[in-house]
């Protein structure tokens, strides 16, 4: 209907020109590398997965510290690493969506977040579908050096066809409120 067309436009505005990669997790663990350039003040990463899939996510910092994320424990996680504070938010189940968003917010403990290769390890436990997508914010809000090692060219140009119809307006609006810099609107005065 009319509302869904508007919704898709909003999602496209958020995710278009974002760097992304996608994959299908089955029996083997997957390793995804993200290069974070120097002088990056903040960065957020979205991981979209199917609620039916159970897998462990381990985020490894450039200095080797491992953060174990449990996506099925809904809520929030806050970890201090070498130079970076890592906030993790796991989306709540919704009757309208089969997709769960896990949102990583990297914040500097001093001026910049830790540069180098950050690695996502996805370790399958109970996989029903296995598909996932990982996104960075649009190019304007990050340095040119910050990118996935093997970006997916399709995802770089488009939003996830699956997510654009199922994402809830509420989630977009709550993220806009929480992450003014991410939305591109800047601080409210």
Predicted segments, located by residue:
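Loop-rich non-cytosolic ectodomains and luminal regions
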Residues: 1-189
């Amino acid at each position: 209907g009319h509302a869904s067309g508007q919704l898709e436009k909003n999602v496209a505005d958020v995710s278009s020109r974002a760097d992304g990669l996608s994959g299908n997790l089955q029996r083997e663990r997957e390793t995804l590398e993200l290069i974070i350039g120097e002088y990056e003040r903040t960065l957020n990463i979205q991981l979209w997965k199917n609620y039916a899939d159970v897998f462990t996510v381990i985020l490894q910092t450039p200095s080797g510290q491992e953060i174990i994320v449990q996506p099925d424990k809904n809520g929030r996680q806050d970890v201090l690493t070498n130079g970076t504070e890592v906030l993790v938010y796991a989306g709540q189940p919704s009757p309208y969506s089969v997709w769960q968003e896990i949102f990583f917010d990297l914040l500097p403990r001093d001026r910049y977040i830790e540069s180098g290769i950050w690695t996502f390890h996805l370790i399958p436990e109970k996989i029903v579908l296995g598909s996932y997508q990982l996104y960075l914010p649009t190019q304007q809000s990050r340095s040119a050096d910050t990118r996935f090692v093997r970006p997916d060219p399709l995802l770089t140009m488009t939003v996830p066809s699956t997510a654009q119809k199922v994402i809830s307006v509420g989630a977009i609006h709550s993220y806009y409120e929480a992450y003014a810099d991410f939305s591109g609107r800047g601080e409210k005065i």
